[in-house]
């Protein structure tokens, strides 16, 4: 079975991505290390407002390098507004990044500290664009909420997601995933950092307004192990567990990280 043109191992991992995706060396790449002493408190930032309708939750899919929970995005039932955004952005999926051990796994870091995993809730600008495909490469096309996950207590809010993983063990498998409000995964405080960045895997478009929550959420060692037990191969091929899928931090190159607090 041919391997995809990118992944996370030595042959096709982040160090190699620039060969096929030159933007990998661009000026607005993500993730980044948030140096708290260099962030700028911006009083003009509004509070984040999320309004997610559980009825829009649709499907859970093993995409080979991760799994996605997808949402119906043909109307404004599940939207993100406020914060640094001047438009309304529609939720279309969320996914996680994790590492081969609990010591690392997040993509963003804070003062060099790595977290065990990271949740990304991905939205597109439905005020200006007519589809995700149209918005994906535009500078103001996407907005992603990033939530750092710290190993510790089991997080009961993750249970429904973990229970669904059995049905999507191998690449290409999908299963219905309905009646779920992902705002339950957010931390109690919505204080955030924000900066202009990119998708953290190919095509690496520099089209993302990042909103990183200051407060982390918990995940247990056992819960993380369930993420890693997913397979990146198709059914019938040799088992290749999804050990890690996190890109190293990229240089800020003059960008400012603003803080809401």
UniProtKB/Swiss-Prot annotation:
Residues 1-31, 240-261 are annotated as: Disordered. This is Carbonic anhydrase 1. Zn(2+) binds at residues 95, 97, 120. It holds the Pfam family Carb_anhydrase. Keywords: Acetylation, Cytoplasm, Lyase, Metal-binding, Zinc. SUPFAM superfamilies: Carbonic anhydrase. It is found in: Cytoplasm. Catalyzes the reversible hydration of carbon dioxide. Can hydrate cyanamide to urea. The modification N-acetylalanine is found at residue 2. One of its GO terms (molecular function) is cyanamide hydratase activity. GO terms for cellular component: cytoplasm. Substrate binds at residues 200-201. Residues 4-261 form the Alpha-carbonic anhydrase domain. Belongs to the alpha-carbonic anhydrase family. Its EC number is 4.2.1.1, 4.2.1.69. It catalyses: hydrogencarbonate + H(+) = CO2 + H2O; urea = cyanamide + H2O. The active site is at 65 (proton donor/acceptor). PROSITE patterns: ALPHA_CA_2. Its main location: cytoplasm. It comes from the Eukaryota. It is an enzyme of class 4 (lyase). Inhibited by acetazolamide. Its cofactor is Zn(2+).
